[in-house]
């Protein structure tokens, strides 16, 4: 969660004692205030939704298992179910169907199939981890020039499907690299000529492809923009509405819980310089996993990430270098006796931090899951060390080499704290073996981590310069490789693009671990894209994040 675009302000005191000079950031206030504190959960309404879902759920299950449905219709149905965020309800049935269809796959069967249908089939397989060959798109290229045929440029639905399919590519799939560029160019040239739902579909894909979006928001937008795709299935339409409204009630209650906790902790009084972003942080964590079973996990991860906001803003927008050195030492000691060594203003935070983790350790130890809490705590200590390194660089005017910057920057991106804290409340999914795999720092984790750092840097480097903060990856890349600012940004974007390919590869079968463990890694990269693609959406949440929070927690779907 990088820092801010506000101009630095100096604080001095006219009294005989001169106060330290502090880089106050004047963060924008919360967009929401106490709005979500007043929510009152109607348990009877949740029970009503849950009961009402049973019949359409059984009907959708029968559709998925229908042996008379041809393969293209079956794959289209599975794709729609996935886009609506309902896959987890029917995962066993869907994988059973895809296992059979994947085994029966024959490239010759696609000779007479149109681009839109092929694209839907391709996405249905790839999203669920089946590596359908990208050769299915070869027939849309010219044999002589190897370029995509201009004749498909008028097939808007086909182009849209091709563009969405290309986002699922892995390294070495040049045809999908070409497909992405070709389809994007053609769609941009056509978008202003389109009308109705198709225009909205294209605009949304160009703004952010489905694969790189927040699952719950993408499901909500799909429901609105693609109703003609699934309205023929009454049961699916009804289930999607009930499901969204059920989840909304559960999630608004979770948001109320963390909002009350935040208010009770009085952080806005004891550390008034910080960003007040409770709904935005909850949204971020919801982006990692929205399924009902992860309710406790979301609450835990949101609280820890809110701790991180206080820490980040203290290092970045308030503390003096000497104060930050003392705070870093105290966090590494992790001992209440260290409280007397740190500035008075940060002592309430320090006590609450240690108390909350102690309670988590007590709770998770009973379940035999203490290691996940320890991993989260150690990540928190790591980021404090990373923050002080950045503060020392800023103080001395030092610009690190790009490799040196990335070594520390991957830590200060906050990825490690958020991702490990997301594991704490996930239950049996996070076994000892799963945690060991996570700690081995596999390629998919490295890729998601890199996106978290560089997407942030590409969007915020100018703001950081204005505030006189430590050099970002853009600055370090320019210094290390002697390139222009434009060239540096282009190179970092290429690194981000390649990292997405590694994430896509890591989600394909056979997988090293279950998709339950991989999904938060994939989804954290998605949330970084949501927050930082167009602006610093966390510091200035009045655009994208406000729209998302309204979609998910304010507006319901009419039944």
Curated annotation (Swiss-Prot):
| Entry annotated with the keyword Metal-binding | yes
Q: Which reaction does it catalyse?
A: (2E,6E)-farnesyl diphosphate = (+)-(R)-germacrene A + diphosphate
Motif span (DDXXD motif)? Answer: 312-316
A single cellular component GO annotation: cytoplasm
Q: Give the UniProt subcellular location, in the record's own words.
A: Cytoplasm
Tissues showing expression: Highly expressed in glandular trichomes. Expressed in roots and leaves.
One GO-annotated biological process of the protein: terpene biosynthetic process
Which residues does the record give as Mg(2+) 3 binding sites? 456, 460, 464
The record's cofactor note says: Binds 3 Mg(2+) ions per subunit.
Q: Which GO terms describe its molecular function?
A: germacrene-A synthase activity; magnesium ion binding
List of residues binding Mg(2+) 1: 312, 316
What does the similarity note say?
Belongs to the terpene synthase family. Tpsa subfamily.
Protein's name according to its UniProt entry? Sesquiterpene synthase TPS3
Q: Which organism is it from?
A: Xanthium strumarium (Rough cocklebur)
């Amino acid at each position: 969660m990088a820092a801010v675009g506000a101009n630095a302000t100096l604080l001095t005191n006219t009294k005989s004692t001169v106060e330290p000079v502090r880089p106050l950031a004047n963060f924008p206030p919360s967009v929401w205030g106490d709005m979500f504190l007043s929510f009152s959960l109607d348990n009877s309404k949740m029970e009503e939704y849950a009961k009402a879902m049973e019949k359409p759920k059984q009907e959708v299950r029968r559709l998925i298992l229908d042996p008379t449905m041809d393969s293209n219709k079956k794959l289209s149905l599975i794709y729609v179910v996935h886009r609506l965020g309902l896959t987890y309800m029917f995962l066993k049935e869907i994988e059973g169907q895809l296992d059979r269809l994947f085994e029966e796959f024959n490239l010759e069967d696609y000779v007479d199939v149109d681009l839109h249908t092929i694209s839907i089939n391709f996405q249905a397989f790839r999203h669920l981890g089946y590596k359908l060959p990208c050769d299915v798109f070869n027939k849309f290229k010219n044999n002589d020039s190897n370029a995509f045929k201009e004749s498909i440029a008028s097939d808007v639905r086909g182009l849209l499907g091709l563009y969405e399919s290309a986002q699922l590519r892995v390294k070495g799939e040049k045809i999908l690299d070409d497909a992405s560029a070709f389809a994007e160019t053609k769609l941009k040239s056509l978008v202003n000529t389109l009308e109705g739902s198709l225009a909205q579909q294209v605009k949304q894909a160009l703004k952010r492809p489905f694969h790189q979006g927040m699952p719950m928001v993408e499901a909500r937008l799909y429901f609105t923009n693609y109703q003609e795709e699934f309205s023929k299935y009454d049961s699916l339409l009804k289930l999607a509405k009930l499901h969204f409204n059920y989840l909304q009630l559960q999630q608004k209650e979770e948001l109320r819980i963390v909002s009350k906790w935040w208010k009770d902790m009085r952080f806005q009084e004891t550390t008034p310089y910080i960003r007040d972003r409770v709904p935005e942080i909850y949204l971020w964590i919801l982006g990692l996993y929205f399924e009902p079973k992860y309710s406790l996990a979301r609450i835990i991860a949101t609280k820890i990430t809110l701790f991180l906001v206080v820490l980040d803003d203290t290092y970045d927008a308030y503390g003096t270098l000497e104060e930050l050195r003392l705070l870093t030492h105290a966090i590494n000691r992790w001992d209440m006796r260290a409280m007397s060594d740190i500035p008075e203003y940060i002592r309430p935070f320090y006590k609450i931090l240690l108390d909350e983790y102690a309670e988590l350790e007590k709770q998770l130890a009973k379940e035999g899951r203490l290691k996940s809490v320890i991993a989260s705590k150690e990540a928190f200590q790591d980021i404090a060390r990373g923050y002080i390194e950045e503060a020392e660089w800023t103080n001395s005017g030092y610009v690190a080499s790009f490799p040196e910057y990335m070594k520390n920057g991957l830590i200060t991106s906050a990825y490690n704290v958020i991702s490990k804290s997301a594991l704490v409340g996930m239950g049996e999914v996070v076994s000892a073996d799963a945690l060991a795999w996570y700690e081995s720092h596999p390629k998919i984790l490295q890729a998601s981590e890199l996106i978290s750092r560089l997407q942030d840097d590409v969007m915020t480097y100018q703001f950081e310069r204005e505030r006189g903060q430590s050099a970002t990856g853009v600055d370090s890349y320019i210094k290390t490789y002697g390139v222009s600012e434009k060239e540096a940004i282009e190179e970092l974007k290429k690194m981000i693009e390649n990292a997405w390919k590694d994430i896509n590869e890591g989600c394909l079968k056979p997988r090293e671990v279950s998709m339950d463990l991989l999904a938060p890694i994939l989804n954290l990269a998605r949330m970084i894209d949501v927050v930082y693609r167009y602006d610093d959406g966390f510091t200035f949440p009045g655009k994208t994040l406000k729209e998302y929070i309204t979609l998910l927690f304010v507006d319901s779907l009419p039944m």
